[in-house]
């Protein structure tokens, strides 16, 4: 029993440290962080366990046909409470991207353990630290 509790605690600590590192990297890059109750990806979830749902946004300046414009890009970071929730969320991200985004939007999804990210590739790269 002690081993199970220790393993659970270690897992929670790793996720917590990972969450702090992700938030720090995004903030250092000029992105904003907000905690959400739901996301476009998780709004249909029933019976799944989510710990934190984070929406990160950052304004990018783009030049199209000589005109500069500001575009706000976003990244959703979903901390799942168990493997079944992470599996469901990973599939929900893929479905969301297929239904709502095109290749030109440059949105991707990524999963690490029980953390699932879905959003603009540059923000996701910052969050993943590469």
What are these regions (language model features)?
Residues 13-15:
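Bacterial signal peptide processing site
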Residues 17, 21, 25, 88, ...:
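Extracytoplasmic/secreted proteins, especially bacterial periplasmic and envelope-associated proteins
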Residues 25-102:
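Short, solvent-exposed recognition patches
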Residues 97-130:
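A short, solvent-exposed beta-edge/loop patch
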